[in-house]
Swiss-Prot record:
Belongs to the SUI1 family. PANTHER family: DENSITY-REGULATED PROTEIN (PTHR12789:SF0), DENSITY-REGULATED PROTEIN HOMOLOG (PTHR12789). Pfam families: SUI1. HAMAP family: SUI1. Keywords: Protein biosynthesis, Translation regulation. PROSITE patterns: SUI1 (PS50296). GO terms for biological process: formation of translation preinitiation complex; regulation of translation; translation reinitiation. Gene3D superfamilies: SUI1-like domain (3.30.780.10). This is Protein translation factor SUI1 homolog. GO terms for molecular function: mRNA binding; translation initiation factor activity.
Amino acid sequence: MGTLDPSVCGGLPPEVCEQLMMDQQELIKIKLEKRKWGREVTIIEGLNLDNERLKKVAKQLKSKLATGGTVKNGRIELQGDHRDRVKKLLEEMGYPPENIVIVG
């Protein structure tokens, strides 16, 4: 993975330290919720970003998916079922595929 800072790992072997670092990375969950009158909403949570950066990511996703959406309570809500396409777009934005999980 590259050189690791010894102060971060203490006396742990490099392999163990790398695994611990990977486990601490954000886990992005993409799920579908049904709202009243059967409307579907794609929810993206687990992006550890401040509110402004979260809004920028939401704006990019809404533009590429041609849909409406919002940012509420630290998560992105998009109108419609876009789970597979959102995963692909997040990967294109640089998020590691192993950290993106489609729930349900």
